[in-house]
C-alpha cells in the first residue's frame, strides 16, 4: 500500500475506527450488560417456555477476510453445486435475526479473521477491526493465521477488538526456550441468570512448522494436553460452570483426537476451526462432542442449551447456512465495508484474466485453483523438473460468469488464492529426497493417528505423477512416481520450484530438508500469476491427475475417517 493510499484509508475509518485500533485489551466482565449489545431486545428478558431457559451459543470461524457474498461449493447427489453465501453485512442481518428470536445469545469467532484477502494485506489487517467490532462478537480465539503480520501486529489487532480474547496455549517467548506469561487470558465465563458457561481456547501449536517461522517469532505454543485438565478443573470445580466449551483452531482431525483423550474429560463441546469442515451433526467422541462451522462466513454454528432449575436438560445443534440472496444487507455494516474498501476497490476488482470452468479448492487431492497456479509456474519456469504448491484450504470458489460468458479472475482473487505474495525459489534435490518427502507429506494428510495429521490438503505438483494409497501404512503409500515421463530415479538430481518461506533454513524448500543450490528468483507468485493470466487471457485449469488416490475417490472432500461425518 502506498503512503497516499494508507492516508486515504486511515481517513475512511475515522476517529472512532482509530480509537478501536488503539484500544487496550482489558479483560471483559461477565455480567449481561457487558456481554450483550443488541438494541433489538430487552437484555433482561429471558427466553423461557414452561420454566425452561434456553441459551444460544453461535460460532463463526475461518472467515478469511471475505467481506462480500461469494460463490460457495456444496456437494449434493455426488456432484458440486454452487450458491451465494456469506458477506459480513448479510451475516450481520442473519445474526440479528437469531438474537431477536433469543436474546440470550453468546457469539464467538474461532480464528483466521485477519488473513485471506487483498484488503487485509493492503491494510495489514486494520480494515477488519471496525468490521469485527461492529459485529458485536462476545469472544474471540486467535487462529493459525493471526500471526501473519508478526507477533506485535497480532497483539495490536486482537487488542483493538472490544470483546475479550481467549487462548490457553500461546505464551511470550523469553528467549532460549524459556516460556513467559500467556499472551491472552486462559478462559472466559459467561454468566446469565445464575448459569455459568466457561470457555477455554486452544490454537494450533504447530503454527511455527505450518507457516513461515518468522510469523510466530516471539511466541511459544504448547499442546492442549499440557494444561487442559487444570483449566477444566478451574471452570468446573472452582467456578462451578454448568457447561464448558473449548474454542479450538486445531483442525477437525486434531479436535476429534483431543476429544478422545482423557485430558478432555469435562469439556462438553469443542467449537472447532482451521480445516473449514462442515459438521452438521455433532461428532460424539469419548469425552466431548466436536463441531466445526465451515468457513468464509458461509455458515453459523448454533448450539441451543435448555436449563431447568439451573440444570442442563436438553441441547440442539444446527449448522445454519448464510443464504446471501435471501438476506437484506445490514445498512451500517454495508457502509463500513464499502468505506474501508474504497481506496483499494478499483485494484481489487481489476480483471486480469478469465476461466472457462469453476474455480475452487475443496478436494483433498487436486483442484482447479491449484492447477491454475501450477500451470502458471510451469509456464514461467519451463526448465524446472517439478513445480510445487502448498495444499492450501483457504479461498472461496469463483464460479459466476460475467458478460463474456467466462468467469472473471480479479487481482483480488489472486490474493484470495495466495494471500502471501511469496518469492519463487528454486533448488535441487535427489530422487531419494523426493520419495521420502512424498511419504511424509501424505502421512501429514492421512495418518491413521489423527493427532499426527498436519497442515492442509495433499501437496500440489506438476512435472511429476504420483499414484498413492491414502490409507496404507506410513512409508508405504506411494505406489508409482514418474518425473518427465520416467520412473523416479532415487539416485538422480532433479530441479524443483516452490515458494520461499520467511525464516526457513537456507537448505529447506517446501519442507524438503537438505536441498542444494537453493536460490530466490526475481519473481513472486502474484507477478507470475498476473503475467500468466494477462498473456493467456482465458484459461481452462482442469486437474490432470498428477496425484491419483487409488483407495478413495478423486473427489475426496475430507481427511477425517472413522467417525460419522461427511462434507456436503
Across the structure, where does each feature detected by a protein language model lie?
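Acidic, metal/ion-coordinating pockets
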Residues: 2, 6-323, 364, 368-376, ...
